[in-house]
Amino acid sequence: MRAISKPATRRSLVAFSRCLATGSLVIATAVAVAPAARAQSGADAVFAVTYLDVGAGAVPQGVELIKKYRDQSRREGANVEFTILQETSRPNRFVIMEGWRDQAAFEAHDKGAAKAEFEGALKPIRNSPPDRKMLQPFANAPARRIEPGALYMVEHVDFLGGDPAIAATAAPLEKTLAEASQKEAGVVRYEIYRMPPPRINHYQVVAAWTDAKAFDAHETAAHTLEFRAATAQGGRAWRANLYDQRLYKAL
């Protein structure tokens, strides 16, 4: 058997090392540039959900515009979340879920150039003015990794009137629903936010499941059915909008 010369061996090792280094660099670069949609937030964090739409013929333009705004916003140091969602059944409708380190950071972004540029470009192609709701964490869970293809659900929950008794009854019902839903096998996000006083009878659910099958399992789960029975007309806390779920995909 002919022995491999030492120079050839050294050349092979050098080439192999270069391949490893290049591969490691590619992996590290991919990890570094992949933006985190959510980060752990502190007690002073401020959140908002915004519903918006564009004309049916302007969907591609709207998608590019909202993606640009997302990328600009995520680069701001005080941003803790900037998730954009597109409605599955009506692709001209979108949701922005954003979070900021504190009120000062939120206000700085709100008055910044990226926000002004986005709203200026959106105005000619939108059907309606954006509808933004300020939120406070109510029943939240640590951020998890959400893989592509997850099915999102955003729901606004409005309990009738400003009756303190109704608000007091609704709060534990919402907590119980969140805690049970967060334990589901297919759930990757289930969080309930509440609007600031005096509108404490308004909640916002932002949730995601691995796929449609996991979402369907949530819909028929005992804790979901119990919550809906308790909040339907004649229940312990009446809802004004029992059927206000919308399904989305992440952009």
Cite the ranges covered by each PLM segment.
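N-terminal secretory signal peptides that target proteins for export/translocation
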Residues: 1-16
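Short beta-strand-to-loop capping motifs
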Residues: 51-54, 98, 156-162, 207-209
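Short, surface-exposed ligand-recognition loops at beta-strand->loop->(often short) alpha-helix junctions
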Residues: 53-63, 158-170
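The feature marks the first
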Residues: 44-88, 95-98
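Glycine-rich beta-strand-turn "strand-cap" elements at beta-sheet edges
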Residues: 39-46, 83-92, 117-160, 189-201, ...
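Bacterial N-terminal signal peptides
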Residues: 17-32
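An amphipathic, aromatic/His-enriched active-site/gating alpha helix that lines ligand/cofactor pockets
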Residues: 2, 41-42, 68-83, 99-133, ...
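Sec/Tat signal peptide C-region and signal peptidase I cleavage site
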Residues: 33-39
